[in-house]
């Protein structure tokens, strides 16, 4: 498969134009006409992650956080980013990032699904796409009323986490997940009490 075939599919599912204006997503390095057979997924492209991907035989790396956020003035072996870009090019590895576009169009719904929320609404609206409101976060009802301790355990198990940090009375009852968002000095209550 050519890299552009995979990136085209990703662009249809998680379009770059859904990302925040400040974000840098999509094909960030490499030749999208390269043949790919092994894709390495990571949260961040650190030097250690890159070394592991190379050792693993990856010819494409997809990360959540882009390693390039703003303009680069030099690409050389004297900076972390420069070394990574040089290595990607020298090894012929294609590098693609999906950050806020994935947060808006994938991660929020996935997180709600994993924690068994239903009747969800978007927490912080960023746009309307194909007749559906899109944005960061979800607010919804839990499968049943439970203690905060039980909900923390549900999150921990559903997301396969080692630890979950919780603030508040662990014995208090919750029936839905609710967030308050601070935006331009205005507090938005999502109506979950």
What is the meaning of each model-derived region?
Residues 1-193:
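Hydrophobic structural segments
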């Amino acid at each position: 498969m050519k890299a552009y075939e995979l990136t085209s599919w990703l662009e249809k599912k998680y379009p770059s134009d859904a990302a925040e204006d400040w974000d840098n997503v999509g094909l960030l390095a490499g030749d999208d006409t390269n043949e790919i057979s092994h894709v390495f997924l990571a949260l961040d492209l650190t030097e250690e992650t890159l070394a592991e991907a190379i050792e693993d035989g990856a010819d494409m790396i997809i990360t959540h956080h882009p390693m390039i956020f703003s303009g680069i003035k030099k690409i050389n072996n004297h900076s972390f980013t420069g070394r990574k870009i040089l290595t990607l090019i020298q090894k012929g590895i294609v590098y693609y990032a999906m950050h806020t576009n994935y947060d808006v169009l994938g991660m929020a719904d996935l997180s709600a699904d994993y924690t068994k929320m239903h009747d969800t609404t978007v927490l912080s609206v960023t746009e309307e796409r194909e007749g559906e409101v899109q944005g960061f976060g979800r607010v919804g009802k839990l499968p049943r009323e439970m203690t905060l301790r039980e909900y923390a355990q549900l999150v921990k198990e559903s997301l396969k986490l080692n630890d979950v940090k919780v603030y508040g009375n662990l014995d208090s009852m919750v029936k839905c997940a609710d967030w308050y968002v601070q935006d331009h000095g205005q507090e938005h209550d999502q109506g979950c009490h």
